């Protein structure tokens, strides 16, 4: 028997067909969220305060310093925050110290800085009672980038861009004549030498001495002539730059100096961030640039004079190993340049310079200039960076160095929650800083306290704005646990500071070789966001700099054995190594079986001797994301269909009684465990008590832990989230074990669907175009039944005419409609409601008109009751009927926080039990989706030789052209698993081979071709051909026909055109468009067409009269002029065109004006009014009938006596 048994948690054992030993467990799948937020609380916040503070006033008398901060206990627990529509947040208190430099007085004070949202254990935030996720953003890393473009003559031209985290961009480029220019912050271009002069190196000789003689530099110097001899070259360049940046303003050297300092050399305005400084140093460092170059000078030890490398040596790995320690020193091959006193930055500049031969002309000597190992604490750019970048730029023209690929994941980084929050917090703090400065100068220095200086509004506002309305703060996808998990692991290239859909080209969206093990090449949405929204691969982690790293097993260089030592490599580090695939065969001691292996290096796949291999993949599934890793036989599916399969698993609806897949991939347990939906044990112990609401565990030290289960909670997606215990009293449970299944879980594993018996066969054409035929048993036995909970709310507000009132005394409503309401007019829990039923009775005061004498008298006698009220009750919308599951009442008296003007709020939850029905969408895990076309009685379904009816029939046409053969393999292996009564695991890229499948089929006693004779349930005759029948994991998706079906009778109209609105949410009509009109014209159906374009659309007068005529049973009147025609005429008249409408006798037809709207007949609400009058009449009749009944009964009683 192939395969071996593996335990997944305590409740499931599977036969796994994996051949590759797992050397590394999957990491915690939501740590990208939790770790990042923890970093923010521990370090990120402090960093921000230390960046902004101390704040000094303009005169330098006062300074405000940051001492410390602390987060206190949250005001609400997670559950309470959900209940009260509040935020789950904790108050932030900051200790500040105010120093008065004149008197030396120091005041310390604790200042409240607003409530700060906290992350729940599941990696989400609760904002206004709703769970939200902050999606990580994929952005270009700050650094220096070199690119190459071909001009129209086919000659390469190079460009350089220095991109900071915050601040002005610096770009270098050459034109067609090979003259080099610089652009500052996307403005007009300036000759490159002007920037060098502005840095304090004014003469041509200085520049040539520093940068060496290159063609482009000499041409640029010719172009850059000394125009105004009154100024020195440095001052002239400064003024030129100022003129380009601020055209039209008076230019002086001083103003230019301060402008350039502010643009580039002020740490508060220009910031590379540590990651940017690391990238710049790496790109401009001598180590990377000297590799494979030929030295044009002899390099010697500066202390001893010992030769390290002779002239004409080609620098390879071995020479670099000797040279490396010297290049890191501050005194090796360094040249110090002192700028003139007029320069922007007057400090001396230290560069490392080594002479090498040009690649294009081996006789020519070229300077390679490094930026001199700048300390990582310099977050802003320094002149050495600019000079080294210019040198790299010129070296590219000599064939030295390499251009950058901006889609390489070494040049794109992740901004996770912590950093996004930090950036937002910085915005708030810098706005606050301005206010503090102003207040310092206004208030009395002797008496002022930190509390009086600080205004926390901008900080609170910026945080609120980020969580409430940022593109990256998203309403969590809560359809099932996999959807939640994927949402937390999502990477988006959109959002502030990222790309936009329209501008993103093909390259950005494409799969790049560096995605391997970092971002899933399969899971991405279809449509305009394809490739811009990605998912983190299963083993990937994000490092401190924000680059995605993936783990590899180290290969020992001397023995060439694969060790269990794991290294996490970022994309740019990985480029230096040769990496073998995870499925390379190994001996028991870790040595490779074969002498050559398949391996990767950069974008090449090569067959290479094992001596060259540096690393080996950890696992075959490290390439893909969690959702993709849930697809068995992924390797047999076409990638487009696998993409659909991965995306559709997230849309599976949690069923009443789910079952984990018979054929899994072994990741189901980990996915369910880390999603945060299962109930996890925190300390080991023994289960002491279990019921549906709580589990109690007695720890080994004697203390008791109580775990509350989540019962029938409405999720973000309107699904039913419910937990069920899976442990028994007396069980010993370990730390981190699953105590209770969440929605779409079974036995601690993900269970998105069921395992029905599936046949690939046609049946009377009912599975044409991917339609699905299902057995009535699936409906009757609630196999695909799910519970959906919808929330409705009603508020009683104060209006201008008086407060609204919740009551059961509603005008014109019979007693029958009120039977389930309590004395306050609120529906009881457990009542069954249909469309249009009242949930909360509410009346709103109407406008009071002048009362007549009789009405005044009645008013005086009966008090308020005679006042006019309008019925504004909350009713069940179309398709919303079900059973009242819960009612929550919030009032001011109970201390609930309500928005201003609201006196009372009622929330009603309606649960619906939805069975599978015609029109529902279903799918497997291989992108094989379809809608249910017919539900066939069990006795009519085809059946197997043993009498088992088939549950689902799929069209065999759906397989060949789509190339998702994985579903067929799953079907056959599933049949074997069903017969053997076991669960199986076939991990992606390392699963069951065809030999394993055939062996399992033989073992299970299924026919050798894995097909079966199938009999027609209606006639009992066998079908001609043998049919593939087996078990496939099939899901019901959240696109249900109940949510989409919709029919309009009388509904709202658009205000201007008076045509019916569109869409289910607006209770709109179906658009009868241009092409539909052609169809009726082609048939000559003139009257049908006329009524569609008039009564049924926007003939305002006509439709009211028609409604009346139908109600009264009179003939329908002639149609009038459609409103949209009148709108067109009015628009033309507004343009000043004299436009009239004439009839056949050339008489003008009067078009009604908007001012005529007082006329009852043509009012927009006329139909509703008419309907209301009819309803009132009917209600009166009903009331009279009710009144008549009791008197009859009393008469009858008298007769009996």
Swiss-Prot record:
This is DNA-directed RNA polymerase subunit beta. InterPro entries: DNA-dir_RNA_pol_bsu_ext_1_sf, DNA-dir_RNA_pol_bsu_external_1, DNA-dir_RNA_pol_su2, DNA-dir_RNAP_su2_dom, DNA-dir_RNAP_su2_hyb_sf, RNA_pol_bsu_bac, RNA_pol_bsu_CS, RNA_pol_bsu_protrusion. SUPFAM superfamilies: beta and beta-prime subunits of DNA dependent RNA-polymerase. GO terms for cellular component: DNA-directed RNA polymerase complex. GO terms for biological process: DNA-templated transcription. Residues 1165-1201 are annotated as: Disordered. It catalyses: RNA(n) + a ribonucleoside 5'-triphosphate = RNA(n+1) + diphosphate. DNA-dependent RNA polymerase catalyzes the transcription of DNA into RNA using the four ribonucleoside triphosphates as substrates. Gene3D superfamilies: 2.40.50.100, 2.40.50.150, 3.90.1100.10, DNA-directed RNA polymerase, beta subunit, external 1 domain (2.30.150.10), DNA-directed RNA polymerase, subunit 2, domain 6 (2.40.270.10), RNA polymerase alpha subunit dimerisation domain (3.90.1800.10), RNA polymerase Rpb2, domain 2 (3.90.1110.10). Its EC number is 2.7.7.6. The lineage of its organism: Bacteria, Bacillati, Bacillota, Bacilli, Lactobacillales.
């Amino acid at each position: 028997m192939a395969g071996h048994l593996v335990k997944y948690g305590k409740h499931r054992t599977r036969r796994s067909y994996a051949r590759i030993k797992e050397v590394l467990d999957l990491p915690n799948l939501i740590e990208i969220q939790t770790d990042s937020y923890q970093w923010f609380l521990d370090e990120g916040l402090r960093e921000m305060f230390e960046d902004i503070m101390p704040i000094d006033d303009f005169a330098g008398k006062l300074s405000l310093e940051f001492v410390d901060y602390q987060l206190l206990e949250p005001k609400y627990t997670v559950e309470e925050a959900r209940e009260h529509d509040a935020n789950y947040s904790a108050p932030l208190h900051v200790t500040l110290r105010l120093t008065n430099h004149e008197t030396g007085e120091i005041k310390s004070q604790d200042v409240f800085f607003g409530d700060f949202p906290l992350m729940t254990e599941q990696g989400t935030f609760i904002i206004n009672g709703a769970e939200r996720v902050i999606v990580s953003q994929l952005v270009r890393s700050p650094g220096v980038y070199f690119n190459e473009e071909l001009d129209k003559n086919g000659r390469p031209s190079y460009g350089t861009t220095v991109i900071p985290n915050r601040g002005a961009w610096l770009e270098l480029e050459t034109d067609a004549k090979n003259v080099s220019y610089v652009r500052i912050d996307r403005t007009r271009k300036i000759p490159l030498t002007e920037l060098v002069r502005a840095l304090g190196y004014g003469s041509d000789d200085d520049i040539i001495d520093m940068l060496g003689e290159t063609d482009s530099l000499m041409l640029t110097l010719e172009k850059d002539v000394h125009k105004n001899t009154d100024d020195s070259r440095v001052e002239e360049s400064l003024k030129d730059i100022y003129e380009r940046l601020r055209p039209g303003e008076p230019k002086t050297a001083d103003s230019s100096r301060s402008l350039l300092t502010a643009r580039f050399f002020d740490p508060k305005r220009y910031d590379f961030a540590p990651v940017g400084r690391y990238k710049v140093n790496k790109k401009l460092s001598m180590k990377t640039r000297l590799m494979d170059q030929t030295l044009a000078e002899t390099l010697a030890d500066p202390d001893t004079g010992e030769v390290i490398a002779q002239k004409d040596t080609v620098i390879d790995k071995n020479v670099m190993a000797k040279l490396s320690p010297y290049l890191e020193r501050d005194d090796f091959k360094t040249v110090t340049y002192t700028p003139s006193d007029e320069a922007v930055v007057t400090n001396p500049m230290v560069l490392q310079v080594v002479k090498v031969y040009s690649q294009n002309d081996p006789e020519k000597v070229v300077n390679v200039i490094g930026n001199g190992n700048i300390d990582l604490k310099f977050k802003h750019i320094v002149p050495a960076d600019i000079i080294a970048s210019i040198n790299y730029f010129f070296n590219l023209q000599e064939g030295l160095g390499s251009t950058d690929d901006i889609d390489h994941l070494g040049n794109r980084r992740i901004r996770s929650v912590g950093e996004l929050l930090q950036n937002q917090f910085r915005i708030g703090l810098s706005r606050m800083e301005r206010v503090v400065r102003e207040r310092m100068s206004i208030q009395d220095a002797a008496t002022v306290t930190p509390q009086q200086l600080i205004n926390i509004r901008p900080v609170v506002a910026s945080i609120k704005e980020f969580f409430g309305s940022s593109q990256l703060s998203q309403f969590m996808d809560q359809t099932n646990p996999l959807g939640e998990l994927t949402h937390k692991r999502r990477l988006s290239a959109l959002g502030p500071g990222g790309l936009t859909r329209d501008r993103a080209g093909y390259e950005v969206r494409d799969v790049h070789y560096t995605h391997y093990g970092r971002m899933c090449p399969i899971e991405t949405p279809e449509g305009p966001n394809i490739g811009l929204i990605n998912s983190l691969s299963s083993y990937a982690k994000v490092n401190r700099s924000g680059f995605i790293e993936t783990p590899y097993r180290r290969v020992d260089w001397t023995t060439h054995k694969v060790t269990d030592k794991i290294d996490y490599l970022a994309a740019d580090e990985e480029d230096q190594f040769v990496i073998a695939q995870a499925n390379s065969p190994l001996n028991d001691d870790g040595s490779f079986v074969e002498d050559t292996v398949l391996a990767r290096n950069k974008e090449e796949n090569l067959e290479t001797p094992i001596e060259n291999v540096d690393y080996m993949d950890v696992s075959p599934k490290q390439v893909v994301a969690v959702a993709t890793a849930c697809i068995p036989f992924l390797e047999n599916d076409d990638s487009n269909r696998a993409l659909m399969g991965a995306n559709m698993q997230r849309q599976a609806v949690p069923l009443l009684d789910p079952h984990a897949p018979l054929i899994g991939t072994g990741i189901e347990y980990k996915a369910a465990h880390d999603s945060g939906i299962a109930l996890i044990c925190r300390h080991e112990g023994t289960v002491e008590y279990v019921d549906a609401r709580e589990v109690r565990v007695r720890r080994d030290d004697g203390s008791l832990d109580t775990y509350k289960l989540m019962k029938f909670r409405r999720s973000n997606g309107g699904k039913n989230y419910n937990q069920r215990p899976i442990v028994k009293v007396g069980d010993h449970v370990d730390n981190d074990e699953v105590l209770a299944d969440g929605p779409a879980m079974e036995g601690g594993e993900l269970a998105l669907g069921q395992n029905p018996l599936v046949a690939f066969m046609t049946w009377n054409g009912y599975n044409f175009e991917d339609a699905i035929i299902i057995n009535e048993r699936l409906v009757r036995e609630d196999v695909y039944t799910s519970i959906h909970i919808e929330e409705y709310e009603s508020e009683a507000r104060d209006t201008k005419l008086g407060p609204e009132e919740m009551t059961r005394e509603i005008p014109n409503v019979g007693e029958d409609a009120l039977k389930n309401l309590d004395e306050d007019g609120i529906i009881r829990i457990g009542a069954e409601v249909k469309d249009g039923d009242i949930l909360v009775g509410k009346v709103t005061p109407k406008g009071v008109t002048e009362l007549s004498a009789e009405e005044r008298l009645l008013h005086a006698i009966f008090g308020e009751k005679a006042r006019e009220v309008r019925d504004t009750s909350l009713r069940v919308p179309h398709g919303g009927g079900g059973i009242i599951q819960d009612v929550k009442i919030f009032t001011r008296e109970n201390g609930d926080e309500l928005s201003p003007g609201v006196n009372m709020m009622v929330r009603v939850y309606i649960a619906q039990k939805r069975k599978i029905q015609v029109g529902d969408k279903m799918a497997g895990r291989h992108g094989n989706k379809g809608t249910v076309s017919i539900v066939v009685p069990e006795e009519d379904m085809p059946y197997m030789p043993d009498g088992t009816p088939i549950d689902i029939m799929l069209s065999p046409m759906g397989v060949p052209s789509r190339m998702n053969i994985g579903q067929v393999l799953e079907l056959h292996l599933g049949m074997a698993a069903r017969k053997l009564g076991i669960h199986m695991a076939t991990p992606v890229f390392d699963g069951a081979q065809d030999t394993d499948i055939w062996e399992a089929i033989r073992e299970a006693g299924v026919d050798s071709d894995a097909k079966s004779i199938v009999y027609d349930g209606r006639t009992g005759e066998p079908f001609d051909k043998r049919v593939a029948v087996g078990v496939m994991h099939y899901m019901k998706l959240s696109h249900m026909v109940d949510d989409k079906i919709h029919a309009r009778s009388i509904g709202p109209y658009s205000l201007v055109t008076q045509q019916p609105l569109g869409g289910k949410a607006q209770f709109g009509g179906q658009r009868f468009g241009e092409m539909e009109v052609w169809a009726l014209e082609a048939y000559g159906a003139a009257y049908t067409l006329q009524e569609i374009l008039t009564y049924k659309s926007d003939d305002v007068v006509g439709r009211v009269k028609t409604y009346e005529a139908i109600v009264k049973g009179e003939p329908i009147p002639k149609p009038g002029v459609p409103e949209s025609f009148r709108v067109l005429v009015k628009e033309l008249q507004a343009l000043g065109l004299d436009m009239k409408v004439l009839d056949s006798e050339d008489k003008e037809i009067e078009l009604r004006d908007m001012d005529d709207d007082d006329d009852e007949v043509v009012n927009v609400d006329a139909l509703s009014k008419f309907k209301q009058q009819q309803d009132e009449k009917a209600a009166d009749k009903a009331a009279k009938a009710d009144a008549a009944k009791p008197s009859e009964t009393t008469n009858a009683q008298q007769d009996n006596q």
